[in-house]
Amino acid sequence: MFVVKYYRMGILDIKMRWYVARREKYANYDLRFEGVTVERNIRYGERKGQVFSLYRKSKKRLPVFVYFHGGALAGRTKGARRAFCAEIAKLGVAVLNVEYKGEVMLGAKECLEECEKILAYLKERSTTLGIDIDRLIFGGDELGAYVASYLATKAENYGIRPVGVVLFSGYYDAIRHAKENSYFESQYQFIKKFYKIDLRRASFDNSVSTYLKSMSVTSMVTEDFPSTFICYSANDEFLPEQSGAMIKAIKQKDVYLWEFKAVDKVVYHNFHLDRRTKESQVVMEYLSAFIKEAVDGGVYSNEYREI
């Protein structure tokens, strides 16, 4: 019975990877920048991979959207989000498409500490970059949503108060993820590489639970967390419980929340990347409204949509 369970999990894991690979394939299918200029590989830290690309339509001082891609442990880079970042830049905001893939391999704590360097960099270089950090939004998908959420809780230490956070198909609750998903080979490897915990050899004792809880952004959300846009699928094949955990944490602190839930059975993880679909197009319309409202004075309302 035990072997059969792992065999079935392995087959499902392969299917999940294939679905995600298809969506990644179409993420940049419509790569038209239409007046958006791109300055590539601007360094924000000393490590080799600590760079970002800057997308903008105008040279004047602009609000800024700082985005972290997903799939870093699977080898994906910021290049996989070029079309998405260019589209956001068309709204009249500067977009930083941040690379952090190398930092992920250091482990969770070290990765987050290294990613914090972007905060110090933005505080120091905002004038040079032509961005308004008083109108800053963090965003990300998958593990990038985890990084974006974490930085939103640390930004005030650098004199930055984000006006919004945008999260897609994200990862937020480490302890819940480890308990519920380590049977999947890809998720077991993620936990092993990122948290340096081998759950097939180590017991889930108090020290492991305490550590994972301390690394969960759901436990870091306070009343001062920025207004949040969160998008996910009810049929997410990779992280089915994660968005619900983050939404619960946000609601408990009375943070303004725009929640978008895809309910169609054939709409899966990171569906926003495939711009051919109506669900992705609808989400992008609402995201445009959220960004404009956030940078024009702040989001002070709650929204819920099933799409």
Q: What are the functions of these language-model segments?
A:
Residues 1-307:
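Alpha/beta-hydrolase superfamily serine-hydrolase fold, recognizing
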